[in-house]
Amino acid sequence: MNVEYGPPESIEDVQSLLRDQNYITDRGLAVALFLSLKLQRPLFLEGEAGVGKTEIARSLALALGTDLIRLQCYEGLDINQSVYEWNHARQMLEIRLMEATGSIDQESASRDLFDERFLIKRPLLQAIDQNRDRPAVLLIDELDRADEEFEGFLLELLADFQITIPEIGTYTTEHPPIVLITSNRTREIHDALKRRCLYHWVEYPDYQKELQIVTTRLPDAPRRLAEQVTGFIQELRETELFKIPGVSETIDWATALMALNQTALEPQVIEDTLGIMLKYEEDIALIRGEPIRSLLERSQNRGPRRRGRAS
């Protein structure tokens, strides 16, 4: 990349850079991101699924003109999937080639087979690649899904941003990654890891912010439709659902309604498109019919003086 890299110079710069990527952020999140960049500290983002935590990392990488490296966490995640592993298939082919040419020697074979040609770099190793001319954005997504043992390894990595591979040596970098860690709080993350990070709780947006998100992402949406969609989603989040719709569902629903040439909400079209907002049959059954009309009526009163349910 030829563009000179530099962190934002102010909180307002953070908001402006993200706005250029169609991501609308409140001041609290902008402050957390600014300090994370300024102090070179990981940022721990916690909140319910669907509030837009992952999108923050994507938008930040685009805004800074750098790479996004994502590590999706899951139960059983270990060093082979997160840091590196050897390409055993290529190593076996190399051994057979050595045997065919008669050039196999135990000492040289061991040295040749364990060099970077056969190394598969996983996200954490990619993030400290020595060839980078600027920090990457490293997203460690849904850490609460991983085992506690992985947290211990991650804590060591965040301490000095270096990884040692016994057969090769130690990898380090002049440009440590910008680290964002997300959690849906399905379990508590160890305090030792949290202490190393800055922390920010990400809420569902209130009416005004979500309306701004919709109109920014979908500038061709009819104003009345955007207002009604936002108000209906805000009311829906106050209903006892198994899975509350997130911001991405709001955008998807508005997009679908535009594809249906809707300029305003009607009970029938809401019922026809419930599957875009809700992903469980129990939730759809709960909302279908008369509840739709009630939610639609209440949503007309939504506006800047009322807020959606905080997560």
Predicted regions, residues:
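C-terminal regulatory/interaction module of P-loop NTP-utilizing enzymes
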Residues: 1-311
